[in-house]
């Protein structure tokens, strides 16, 4: 665990730790990881681009009071964004299946959830660890399933 780390990680270091976490949790071989992560990272980039559009609109709504029509437009955009992301995930599921098993894809999804939970837990830690430099990034899990 990174309980002693209170440094801001570069995007590359964060991605490296995230990939190590997912690889270990899903028990990917080196060959599987080498084939899987370029596809996975492409999906994540496309999802981020969609989310950036919505977050920009949400930021704008906090900076100035919008009328009802603008809030309606914002909510419709959020809904359309969720649908677009779901569609991307379905498309990429087919691509993931070409390089790893459904079982390992499922484990990746589970690992993503656990990784996020551990990030949030790190942000809530007494003393505000990570507050100045962001949350500590979880290390790859052990194969101890009692977590």
Give the location of each predicted region:
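Proteins with a high burden of low-complexity, intrinsically disordered sequence enriched in S/T/G/P/A and R
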Residues: 1-4, 26, 105
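Amphipathic alpha-helical segments
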Residues: 7-8, 18-99
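Amphipathic, charged alpha-helical segments and their helix-to-coil junctions
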Residues: 86-147
